[in-house]
């Protein structure tokens, strides 16, 4: 197994990249749950800006896609007429400070200046970002600064503007850009301005070129002089606001009047609140940093009250078109539910708001209830490319949504939410399964012709995970009805009790009715032990683990499978195997210079937050033994082991009661 090392490994909060190689660079993301800003090897610029909930139908797969937005924080520095670039600087380092959610960079330009820059996606302002820049002159010099806005590729009708506005008694100079998305469906807008220190205000000019514009200022600096300023701005689309161009201007003026110090204080306060829910590992500094990195990305890619869920790549880029899959409900939701239920609730709000679309999807396919799409975007209708079998046939996602809703109630005990939002989801997904099953001659219920969770198994009958999550969904519906004192459909428990599962002669669970031992893309059967918890017998769990771990190829398979192996081995008491698969779940997937996680070993598509969610489940529910009680509700702890060299794990502010759990190595 390849284990990658990255600089700054012993710091629990800061990942340092001290060798910036533009040819082997996979950027880090600072994000606030709405606005994702992805770093670049080029100083003070971004490689990508991503807006959550912003889709247009173009390009890949002829379905809705995430859009690259305006990189409104991009800044160029010239010193004595020479622009600072990657090829004329030295000692360029970058750091991700996860505790404060900031991307920091340092560089030296010739013998003339040292520069420090910091990029923030402001947590308190979902559509706003800021970059602070500090220059220390090592000689007398002339500094020229340009904040640039370029029209993103494919955007049309570009309208650049420069305005000098009187806001109260303050003059604010705004640079704004407005375009249409590639099909013209959305209006896209961005605005930015400079924030100067101590009320000073150099003369700000403006320039335009084809498809771009900039605002600029110049000033002389004496040797030893330190000068700091900031670029602040906002971006949004008509998916977020009916008048985005004026709203980004208003938000930019708001930031201008707040000032740098207050903006940073509010940002840090929000991240202090998020990090009150923490995982603290005693005895392994590298694992501590890695776990913080995974938590950081989950926190960064979602925000309370947004009504949005998370794509497999979060806000780190355009991977998977920004669509929402089972990844959200099965892999990311459970750790967030324990750490920050209010963030997890946003993911369920997303599903609840799209329940009418799920009903129509079931109707289109001849079923009852609600059938959630395999790939979901803004509308909640199916957004899988027509060339993929998963859209019409990977039905397990419906059960994942229904079970997630019950898990939320189990942890929070929020009966009002269950009545108003949770039960409609749980009931209608259960109704779907009743209409989806077929009663066989064996008096068992079968779910035929599906794509398995192991997606290499297409158009198979009785996939283990599909049947298992459907069975659990049906059981949860009956429990939810009892919790609310409403009448349950008798068919829910009848179908659940007679759901078909296949086994080999030696007792190993068979992945589907015709499975003959082929390699698997990702775990399927093993999910029956967790999170479905259908298989509870120690020997059966171990037999299934031993069989299917040997069916997983070394490469080209998603990262979360090994996380489930690790979790189950921890619960079975096998600490060495648990540690091996814990590392195997993400270490070979890390990419330079920050160790961002790709989907597969040797992959090049970070950040795979699905994998992070899986590993966090390993730590919380495997090594820590935390468990959601589906029957009695609430959280409990089950017996488990942690890696031998770990001394303890502390979980802080868990669940709505914000409990603390400390688990010591035995």
Protein language model features and the residues they cover:
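C-terminal capping/lid segments that line or modulate ligand- or cofactor-binding pockets
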Residues: 22-54, 331, 379-383, 439, ...
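Acidic/polar, glycine-enriched structural segments that form the non-catalytic walls/loops
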Residues: 9-30, 34-320
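Active-site neighborhood of glycoside hydrolase catalytic domains
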Residues: 408, 414-423, 442-452, 456, ...
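Bacterial Sec-dependent N-terminal signal peptides
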Residues: 1-10
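Alpha-helical scaffold segments in carbohydrate-active enzymes
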Residues: 293-300, 350-357, 424-436, 472, ...
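Helix-terminus loop motifs that line ligand-binding clefts
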Residues: 302-316, 342-403, 409, 416-420, ...
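Active-site core of glycosidic bond-cleaving carbohydrate-active enzymes
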Residues: 324-354, 403, 410, 420, ...
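A conserved hydrophobic secondary-structure block that centers on an alpha-helix together
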Residues: 111, 123-128, 407, 412-416, ...
